[in-house]
């Protein structure tokens, strides 16, 4: 298929009803629709009827219920992330910035384990900060070392220059008097 084209996959109505109810489904009449754009693809569930009124998806969002049968979409997405193998999860967490590790530590046990491994392996060596330490202080934009506003900048002290000794191309132990006589006469 060419880029930007859509492909919709649907089932016949009688097969759809049999599969939803007979295979232990909820009988919601959901069908699989697949959109292709560019190099990625999206999978979307769309209702084919008015059965959504009694569905768990239209229940009002309130307090979290501890029931495993009613899970929200956000929990389902986090569960998919937690179901990944630990090494892949560690690689994902290595892409997170250093300041966000504390928030990831409190998400779940599996993400906490992956965060600990990523912190020991990846973040122990590369811990860059978004802003420079000297430009951003605790209480706003401060100057380093409490410098007053004299419009004087602190210059870095010059490092002492190393003495460089040039090795002579002429060997001093040799007698080169014959060469100099031939050149200057």
From Swiss-Prot:
GO biological process: cellular response to hypoxia; response to 1-aminocyclopropane-1-carboxylic acid; response to abscisic acid; response to bacterium; response to jasmonic acid; response to osmotic stress; response to salicylic acid; response to salt stress
Signal peptide span: none
Cross-referenced PROSITE patterns: FBOX (PS50181)
Classification via InterPro entries: F-box_dom, FBS1-like
Sequence ranges assigned to domain F-box in this UniProt record: 78-126
Protein name, UniProt field: F-box protein At1g61340
């Amino acid at each position: 298929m060419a880029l930007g084209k859509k492909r919709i996959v649907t089932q016949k109505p009688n097969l759809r009803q049999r599969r939803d109810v007979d295979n232990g489904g909820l009988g919601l009449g959901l069908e699989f629709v697949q959109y292709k754009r560019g190099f990625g693809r999206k999978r979307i569930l769309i209702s084919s009827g008015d059965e959504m009124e009694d569905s768990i998806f239209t229940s009002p969002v309130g307090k979290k219920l501890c029931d495993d049968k009613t899970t929200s979409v956000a929990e389902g997405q986090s569960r998919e992330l937690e179901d990944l193998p630990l090494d892949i999860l560690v690689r994902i967490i290595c892409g997170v910035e250093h300041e966000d590790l504390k928030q990831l530590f409190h998400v779940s046990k599996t993400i906490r384990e992956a965060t600990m491994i990523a912190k020991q392996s990846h973040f122990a060596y590369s811990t860059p900060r978004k802003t420079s330490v000297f430009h951003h202080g605790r209480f706003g934009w401060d100057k380093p070392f409490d410098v007053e506003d004299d419009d004087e900048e602190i210059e870095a002290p010059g490092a002492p220059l190393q003495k460089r000794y040039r090795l002579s191309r002429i060997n001093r132990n040799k007698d080169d008097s014959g060469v100099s006589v031939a050149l200057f006469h």
